[in-house]
Each structure stands twice: as C-alpha cells, then as structure tokens.
C-alpha cells in the first residue's frame, strides 16, 4: 500500500466560503437563492435587495 492520499497541499478548510462571505457580502447566500422556491425567494429579496441579481439565469449557475 503506497500512500497517495496527501498528494494535494494542505489548505485551510472553508476558505472559499469565508472569502465569499466577507468580500462579496450577500453573495454567500447564492446557494440558498438557487434552492429556495420563488415564494421564499421573494421574502429573501425583500430582506436583501442585491440577492436577486445572483439568482438570475446565467449569472452564476
């Protein structure tokens, strides 16, 4: 048994998520906006006006 488990260099976990949360503000919610039904998306858009642009088709996913 040869070890090929640690081929990738170690990096801190959740670094990408934390970076998104701090640099882009509400952009960290993009995962929620894609999975929520439209009714709750309306309430989310009412609370955070910038989130609506990330749920547009073709912007992120």
UniProtKB/Swiss-Prot annotation:
Q: According to the lineage, what is the superkingdom? A: Bacteria
Q: What range does the record give for the signal peptide?
A: 1-28
Induction is noted as: Repressed by RicR. Induced by copper.
In the UniProt record, does the keyword Signal occur?
yes
Q: Which UniProt keywords apply?
A: Signal
Upon gene disruption, the observed phenotype is: Mutant shows wild-type copper resistance. Mutation does not attenuate growth in mice.
Name it. Answer: Uncharacterized protein SocA
Instruction: Name the encoding gene, please.
Output: socA
